[in-house]
């Protein structure tokens, strides 16, 4: 029997096959990152790091992996927005760093939307599986912000600088199949197969030669932890600085207004509304 040992909005489930599952579990909000969720993610990631089992599975409940920052939590704070965004980013970044530095393999399962910070969080896995219908979108520049959660560090290393610039600057959307072709994810699978495939992959790793897997992962990531940490700090500084500016505040307000009109049934607003952050 699996044993749940943490609380909402992020949970830890320890499976008998030595897979430790870290589950984003706030599906009603698309697993969006506000301060409470970011701090819960940080704390659970650190708890996992203290006892990671044989492999870690990072997944999310509901129809979206993570829609990124909760713009409704950001909006209306005026010049205090930057301080709040910095707190959210710093907590989420501590989680990314803890997961990146885990000695055991990490498998990520992505379903639905992975937007904004959800992209960086997804990419922390050693092996990333995505539903074919998953949708990856950075979305930051559309609302006057810059990437966080390590997205601007992971992307050039995974897809190359040209494609990373395309994703970050134009907010291009990639499906799970696109992401596999680009090298953003390890492989894409049918949506109904994702959970089983991801757990099977993690369980296979947990049952493998533990010392060899840890050593191999150490070689793959040798010397990069400190570099990632410095980059995360700079991402947090930049996104917080921009969040205090008029451009970002106006764009976030416009984004939320478009979403509200779309929900009210305005087809024109729905066509124009971005499909990312909550």
Each language-model region and where it sits:
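C-terminal alpha-helix plus adjacent terminal tail
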Residues: 1-17, 48-51, 171-176, 196, ...
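Crotonase-fold acyl-CoA enzyme core
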Residues: 9-12, 97-213, 245
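Terminal peptide-recognition signature
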Residues: 22, 26, 40-41, 58, ...
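Hydrophobic alpha-helical membrane-association signature
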Residues: 37-40, 88-91, 235
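Glycine- (often His-adjacent) and acidic-residue-rich active-site loop
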Residues: 60-95, 114, 227
């Amino acid at each position: 029997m699996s044993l749940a040992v943490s609380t909402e909005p992020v949970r830890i489930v320890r499976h008998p096959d030595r897979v430790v599952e870290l589950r984003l579990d706030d599906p009603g909000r698309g697993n969006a990152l506000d301060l409470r969720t970011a701090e819960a993610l940080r704390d659970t990631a650190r708890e996992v790091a203290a006892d990671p089992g044989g492999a870690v599975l990072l997944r999310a409940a509901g129809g979206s992996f993570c829609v990124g920052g909760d713009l409704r939590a950001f909006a209306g704070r005026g010049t205090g927005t930057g301080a709040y965004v910095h707190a959210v980013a710093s907590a989420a970044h501590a989680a990314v760093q803890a997961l990146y530095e885990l000695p055991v393999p990490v498998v990520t399962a992505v379903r639905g939307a992975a937007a904004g910070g959800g992209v960086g969080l997804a990419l922390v896995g050693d092996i990333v599986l995505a539903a074919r219908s998953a949708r990856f979108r950075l979305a930051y520049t559309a609302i006057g912000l810059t990437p966080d959660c390590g997205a601007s560090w992971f992307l050039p290393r995974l897809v190359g600088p040209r494609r990373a610039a395309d994703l970050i600057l134009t907010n291009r959307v990639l499906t799970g199949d696109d992401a596999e072709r680009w090298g953003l994810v390890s492989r894409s699978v049918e949506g109904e197969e994702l959970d089983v495939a991801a757990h099977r992959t993690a369980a296979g790793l947990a049952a493998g030669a533990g010392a060899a897997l840890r050593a191999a992962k150490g070689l793959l990531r040798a010397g990069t932890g400190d570099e990632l940490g410095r980059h995360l700090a700079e991402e947090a500084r930049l996104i917080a600085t921009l969040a205090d500016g008029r451009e970002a505040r106006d764009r976030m307000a416009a984004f939320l207004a478009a979403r509200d009109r779309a929900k009210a049934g305005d087809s024109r607003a729905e066509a124009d509304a971005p499909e990312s952050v909550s």
